[in-house]
């Protein structure tokens, strides 16, 4: 294993950690690491791995936003509620590093639903659905990252 491969492996590991602990953009970091490896390896297999990683990343991003969003809509959570959650998630990201993005989203959904529905009892089920949507989104992104990492490992052995 050469130095570039080891560094790329570490970057991929950091990217996977960044998906769970959102300090770094995990999936873009993993994708960029595979691009670095493919450009350094200069092999057909390397570029096939990069192409596959690109397709997987795009598919993962699509599913990461499409599936939880559909789930929220199915559960009766409106787009304005989702946008309120997104706005407070952005604020939370800067106010409370790492966990603020999650807390902000949940708080935004809760406050929006509370103002629409009037009571805590009516707003809380929507808030729980928002938590499930967050977990689904993170799960999809993590699975995508693991799939790209596995593809890269296969590529490393194929080019060795």
Regions from the language model: what does each represent?
Residues 13-19, 35-39, 58, 90-91, ...:
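Alpha-helical transmembrane segments of multipass membrane proteins
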Residues 62, 93-114, 118, 138:
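Mid-bilayer segments of alpha-helical transmembrane spans in multi-pass integral membrane proteins
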Residues 29-45, 88-93, 107-116:
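Interfacial segments of multi-pass membrane proteins
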Residues 148-160:
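Juxtamembrane boundary at the C-terminal end of a transmembrane helix
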Residues 70-77, 121-129:
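Short amphipathic alpha-helical coupling elements at transmembrane boundaries
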Residues 12-29, 88-98:
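Transmembrane alpha-helix interface/packing and boundary motifs in multi-pass membrane proteins
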Residues 48, 52-93:
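Helix-adjacent hinge/juxtasegments
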Residues 94-96, 129-143:
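Individual transmembrane alpha-helices with interfacial aromatic-anchor signatures
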């Amino acid at each position: 294993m050469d130095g570039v491969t080891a560094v790329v492996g570490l970057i991929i590991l950091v990217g996977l950690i960044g998906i769970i602990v959102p300090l770094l953009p995990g999936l873009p970091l993993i994708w960029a690491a595979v691009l670095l490896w493919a450009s350094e390896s200069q092999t057909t297999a390397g570029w096939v791995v990069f192409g596959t990683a690109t397709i997987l990343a795009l598919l993962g991003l699509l599913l990461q936003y499409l599936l939880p969003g559909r789930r929220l809509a199915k559960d009766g959570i409106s787009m304005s509620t989702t946008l309120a959650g997104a706005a407070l998630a952005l604020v939370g990201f800067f106010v409370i590093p790492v966990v603020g993005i999650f807390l902000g989203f949940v708080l935004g959904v809760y406050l929006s639903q509370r103002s629409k529905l009037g009571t805590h009892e009516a707003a809380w089920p929507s808030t729980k659905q928002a938590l499930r949507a967050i977990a689904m989104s993170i799960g999809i992104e993590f699975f995508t990252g693991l799939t790209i990492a596995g593809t890269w490992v296969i590529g490393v052995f194929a080019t060795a």
